[in-house]
A protein has these predicted regions:
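Glycine/small-residue-rich loop that forms an oxyanion/phosphate-binding "nest" at active or ligand-binding sites
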Residues: 64-114, 118
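Short active-site oxyanion
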Residues: 25-31, 104-108, 156-157
């Protein structure tokens, strides 16, 4: 019976590539890669000549079936690798693993680097339990709601963030959960590696003052403070967009001005427009 190997690769420093990972990638018949161009550079660095096929976010369902069918038909072993770190952890790969397991193929881990574990290990925080949330919503109000939900569900949270959005994330945390302790690791194992630690407002300030703050991807660890977390009964129930538009009308605003007010708060344009249509229907 064939085997699917889930192979962790370096998150930046090639010295972290394990001998077992090298041997596995050399010995399988095919490597399913998130981006074949990125993985090809890694293979070239270790003189590995195994054929590659793409298996990424946009094609993984169709490709997973094709790969599994070929594994069974030709009785070949396959490895899955992403651009960096461990597949399936906020990265492609889980669809292929699920498809293989459903077909009776054994999935075997070849462990190695992962940004999440690396960031936790240098956080300086006590880690008895944590929750990994991957990437968070971009829209401001959705992000704030998600942060409060995370704080209620976990003592310690780990997230990924891009260098261009990390300041917005820290600012949102500082606004709704200001006593949060943060460990923000940037560009782990690479040239501009740096970890900032402290209360979220201080980490935000240091990030804003750091000219190299946008040089690499971030993995952040948040330790919430109970003082910031509203009890479920105390948590405010936000008004619907429709109700907020009616509130604006009651304050003497035109519907257009009430819509503009919501858009200025960061609400989504299509959602505000849909709410305005419902308001017009009720006023007709």
């Amino acid at each position: 019976m064939p085997t699917l190997y889930v192979v962790a690769t370096p998150i930046g420093n090639l010295g972290d590539m394990s001998p077992r990972a090298i041997a596995t990638l050399q010995n399988v018949a095919l490597i399913a890669a998130e981006d074949t161009r990125v993985t090809q550079k890694l293979l070239s660095a270790f003189d590995i000549h195994t054929p590659l096929t793409s298996c990424h976010e946009h094609n993984q369902r169709q490709k997973a079936r094709q790969i599994v069918e070929r594994m069974l038909a030709e009785n070949i072993d396959v490895a899955v690798a992403t651009d960096a770190g461990t597949p399936c952890i906020s990265d492609p790969g889980c669809v292929l693993v699920a498809e293989a397991v459903a077909a009776g193929i054994e999935a075997v881990a070849v462990p190695g680097p992962t940004a999440m574990a690396s960031a936790l290990s240098v956080s300086g925080m006590e880690i008895s339990e944590f929750t990994f949330f991957g990437f968070l919503p971009r829209q401001k109000n959705e992000l704030k709601e998600k942060l409060l939900d995370m704080a209620r569900r976990s003592k310690l949270a780990v997230v990924h963030e891009s260098p261009h959005r990390v300041k917005d994330l820290l600012a949102a945390v500082a606004e709704v959960l200001p006593h949060t302790q943060v460990s923000a690791s940037c560009d782990l194992t690479k040239k501009y590696e740096k970890t900032l630690r402290g209360v979220v407002g201080e980490v935000l300030r240091q990030t804003e003052e750091n000219p190299k703050a946008e040089k690499g991807e971030y993995c952040l660890v948040f330790a919430w403070d109970e003082r910031d977390i509203p009890a479920p009964a105390e948590a405010a129930c936000p008004l619907s967009l429709e109700a907020q538009l009616f509130d604006g009308l009651m304050r003497g605003l035109t519907l257009r001005d009430a819509m503009a007010e919501l858009l200025a708060r960061g609400e989504r344009k299509n959602a505000v427009y849909a709410a305005s249509l419902r308001v017009k229907e009720k006023l007709a």
